């Protein structure tokens, strides 16, 4: 039992870290056309980059819109409000809001839970399932009205769920950009290019710096940046107060966690193999007798592999129980969000069930298969 429990604890740690690593390296993969989806950034002559949009409020004659290129298939603009509020009845709730249009959910296809995933009128709003549960405690939110921070009454027309993979945006509420004439906030662009388009050539095409009034005539230019690379990127700045809707990652942390995972797995395997080998010492005579009665190499390996397969299966079941029990602590205490990915978890489990018994069987097999039966039979039972 100690052998199984030790392996289970090691596997639980390894699986938790592997699931987190997978979650981090698959950010935005729910976007169906991620390879052709891009953001815009504003670049200054000194190389400074800030995430931006193609909005030209001043109708500046020097402005060149990179999104007028025929290779642009679809685009949207959105505005983040990371410290927003809504009122339901007499209760005020703090929320994170995205102000945008219907194309936003076409490029980033968050799964629809109920209602419609489009903003047909200025007073339409879409909320996340997380916010729906927070506001209405299980009641159907479709058709209900809430008071937005601008004082406007907005109607909930749709509820969206969590995407299958992590998103670079964290928000609770989507409001139509048509609700207000001017939002007095910086906006950001999300673009879908035609398949096969080389964004680097587009950047070369728009490499000329512009002197725009909105940047006080400081030379700037708008460039495309792949959405798939944004999460770990450190070159593009985001000006916020530390409570941004944007989520960013650190690739160096992922590499460190990968090394830790390998170390934990090696330690767990060595522990398991050592204890299993000690147990096998007491059964050396059993293998010697079986060899005398005709057991071959395949028979010895099959027995050792089957035993390790059963032990690994038991350890894996215990490890998943540990993961489920500690899941709430990971999310609420350690602030590490866990996005459930059944497909990846199943692949991990199958991989563990096949590879671990194989790895843990090699040393005992080599040790006892090539020992002569007479030596094994003379061993102390």
Predicted regions and their residues:
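Hydrophobic alpha-helical transmembrane segments
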Residues: 196, 202-205, 286-302, 338-349, ...
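Membrane-helix entry/capping segments
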Residues: 1, 208-261, 281-282, 326-348
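Intracellular coupling helices
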Residues: 1-2, 6, 270-311, 370-381
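Mid-to-C-terminal secondary-structure elements
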Residues: 98-113, 125-249
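Structured, solvent-exposed hinge/loop segments at the ends of secondary-structure elements
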Residues: 14, 18-139, 148-155, 204, ...
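Hydrophobic alpha-helical transmembrane segments of multi-pass inner-membrane transport and secretion
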Residues: 1-24, 248-285, 313, 317-318
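Small-residue-rich transmembrane alpha-helices
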Residues: 12, 16-19, 308-370
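Short juxtamembrane loops and helix-capping segments at transmembrane helix boundaries
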Residues: 25-34, 170-175, 238-241, 321-348, ...
């Amino acid at each position: 039992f100690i052998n199984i429990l030790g392996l289970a604890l090691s596997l639980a740690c390894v699986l938790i870290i592997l699931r987190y690593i997978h979650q981090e390296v698959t950010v935005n993969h729910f976007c169906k056309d991620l390879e052709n989806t891009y953001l815009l950034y504003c670049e200054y002559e000194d190389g400074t980059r800030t995430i931006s949009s193609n909005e030209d409020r001043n109708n500046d004659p020097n402005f060149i819109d990179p999104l007028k290129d025929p290779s642009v298939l679809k685009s949207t603009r959105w505005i983040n409000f990371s410290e927003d509020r809504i009122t339901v009845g007499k209760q005020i709730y703090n929320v994170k809001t995205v102000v945008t249009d219907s194309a936003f959910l076409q490029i980033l296809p968050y799964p629809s839970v109920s209602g419609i995933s489009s903003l047909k009128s200025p007073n339409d709003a879409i909320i996340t399932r997380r916010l729906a549960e927070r506001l209405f405690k299980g009641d159907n939110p479709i058709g209900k009205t809430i008071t937005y921070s601008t004082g406007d009454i907005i109607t909930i027309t749709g509820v969206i769920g969590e995407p299958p993979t992590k998103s670079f945006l964290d928000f609770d509420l989507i409001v139509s950009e048509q609700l207000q004439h001017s939002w007095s906030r910086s906006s950001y662009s999300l673009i879908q290019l035609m398949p096969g388009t080389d964004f680097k050539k587009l950047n070369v095409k728009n490499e000329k710096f512009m002197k725009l009034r909105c940047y006080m005539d400081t030379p700037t230019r708008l460039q495309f940046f792949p959405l798939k690379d944004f999460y770990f990127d450190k070159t593009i700045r985001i000006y916020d107060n530390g409570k941004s809707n944007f989520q960013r990652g650190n690739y160096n942390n992922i590499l460190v966690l990968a090394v830790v995972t390998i170390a934990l797995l090696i330690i767990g395997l060595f522990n398991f193999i050592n204890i299993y080998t000690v147990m096998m010492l007491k059964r050396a005579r059993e293998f010697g007798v079986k060899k005398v009665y005709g057991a071959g190499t395949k028979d010895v390996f099959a027995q050792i592999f089957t035993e390790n397969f059963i032990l690994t299966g038991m350890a894996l079941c215990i490890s998943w129980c540990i993961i489920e029990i500690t899941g709430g602590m990971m999310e609420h205490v350690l602030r590490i969000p866990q996005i459930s990915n059944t497909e990846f978890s199943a692949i991990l489990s199958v991989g563990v069930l096949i590879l671990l018994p194989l790895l843990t069987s090699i040393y005992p097999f080599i040790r006892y298969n090539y020992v002569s039966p007479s030596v094994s039979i003379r061993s102390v039972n």
